[in-house]
């Protein structure tokens, strides 16, 4: 769904997905765990206020060559001037940079995060997929902030199959057709394995 700052135009379409969102699950306060080089990690970030409660998703993946280096980003969605744009943004650095006030994933913009550790991960594949997606056209059901994050996770680690990233409505991959709030907080709990708790950011 479009990011919180853009609540006009196509972002209002996200309200059509609100009915799909169930009551929010209890969250556990936690801090990110340090991972040694060689282990991978993928994380969803969730803003529950965007799109009338349907939510907006950001993403991050860990560089397996370094103990504390990530790339992260978001597909902020279309604007009135660019009604089909993905609104792609990307950055990199340590977790403290990711969570800094000036970050595109700053805690002031997102409410929760949820991560999964992977045995390995290819950050170059993730970056390549991001660049491809950045040139595509936004679609509310099949090509948005949530599905884009899922595509990047799949490119990063072949282990991120439907067992970990369940399909959405009508078998759409990466939660297509479902709201980010419902998918990240609820469906990853009831229909997926390997995910950590929903942490307040």
Q: PLM ranges: what are they?
A:
Residues 9, 16, 32, 65, ...:
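N-terminal compositionally biased, intrinsically disordered segments and leader/signal-like regions
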Residues 37-109:
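Glycine-rich catalytic cores of cysteine/serine-nucleophile enzymes that process amide/ester linkages
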Residues 47-49, 108-117, 131-140:
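Second-shell loop/turn segments in exported
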Residues 1-36:
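Secretory targeting and sorting signals
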Residues 51-54, 116-123, 138-146:
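Solvent-exposed, acidic/flexible segments
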Residues 125-201:
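Activation targets extended, charge/polar-rich intrinsically disordered C-terminal tails
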Residues 19-24, 33-38, 107, 189-201:
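Extracellular cell-wall/glycan-interacting regions and their flexible linkers
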